[in-house]
Amino acid sequence: MTENQQLTALVAACHWIGEKGWCPATGGNMSVRLDDAQCLITESGKDKGSLQTEDFLLVDIATNHVPSGRTPSAETGLHTLLYRREPTIGAVLHTHSVNATVLSRVEKGAELVLHGYEMQKSLAGQTTHLDRVVIPIFDNDQDIPALAQRVTEFASHTPLRYGFLVRGHGLYCWGATVKEARRHLEGLEFLFQCELQRRLLEAKA
């Protein structure tokens, strides 16, 4: 895809995310890789449901430098970290949905394990509900470099797949393309809602 096609796809994904209510109050951030050296990421403080192409900033993946001098998302470092570590990642979507935020707090451990759901097959490489889908959970931190370091340490021994949760904060998910990242986001949101409902019903039983 050309740069314009990639950006058009990402803008459409942002509008869809806004309609879903997954990034309220200008929260969240989205990006797309242009090549090995550069990505485009949302400018800070923009409503995701009404983004336009001019609301995305060019960022150097190696240094986080923004040639325009404008202010990118505060969490730019997590996007560029993912692009550096995983060359196959082509787009990153970070959302603040209720399901992701609450489930990341309800689950007290370091990971959320999903098992037995047909929708697991929405994730690349998943072929059966019998497998386990493991979503890491990292404690929230306003110090983004410190949070990025914890993600780096995790990734040094465990491959990053599909996404991770930041406790009380939201979901980071990705894909080889904007289209795949969007499918992963929709699939994970469905799975999170199912898991929350399951836990709620079991607690009442």
From Swiss-Prot:
Gene Ontology molecular function, alphabetical: methylthioribulose 1-phosphate dehydratase activity; zinc ion binding
Q: Does the keyword Transmembrane apply?
A: no
Disulfide cross-links: none
Gene3D superfamilies from the entry? Class II aldolase/adducin N-terminal domain (3.40.225.10)
Its recorded reaction(s) are: 5-(methylsulfanyl)-D-ribulose 1-phosphate = 5-methylsulfanyl-2,3-dioxopentyl phosphate + H2O
Q: Quick one: which pathway? A: Amino-acid biosynthesis; L-methionine biosynthesis via salvage pathway; L-methionine from S-methyl-5-thio-alpha-D-ribose 1-phosphate: step 2/6
Keyword tags: Amino-acid biosynthesis, Lyase, Metal-binding, Methionine biosynthesis, Zinc
**Which Enzyme Commission number(s) are listed?**
4.2.1.109
Identify the domain of life. Bacteria
Name the GO terms of the biological process aspect: L-methionine salvage from methylthioadenosine; monosaccharide metabolic process
Q: In which residues is Zn(2+) bound?
A: 94, 96
- The yes or no answer to whether the keyword Lyase is present is yes
Cofactor requirement? Zn(2+)
What InterPro entries does its record include? Answer: Aldolase_II/adducin_N, Aldolase_II/adducin_N_sf, MethylthioRu-1-P_deHdtase_MtnB
- NCBIfam families from the UniProt entry: PRK09220.1 (NF006672), salvage_mtnB (TIGR03328)
Protein family according to the UniProt entry:
Belongs to the aldolase class II family. MtnB subfamily.
Q: What does this protein do?
A: Catalyzes the dehydration of methylthioribulose-1-phosphate (MTRu-1-P) into 2,3-diketo-5-methylthiopentyl-1-phosphate (DK-MTP-1-P).
State the name under which the record lists this protein.
Methylthioribulose-1-phosphate dehydratase
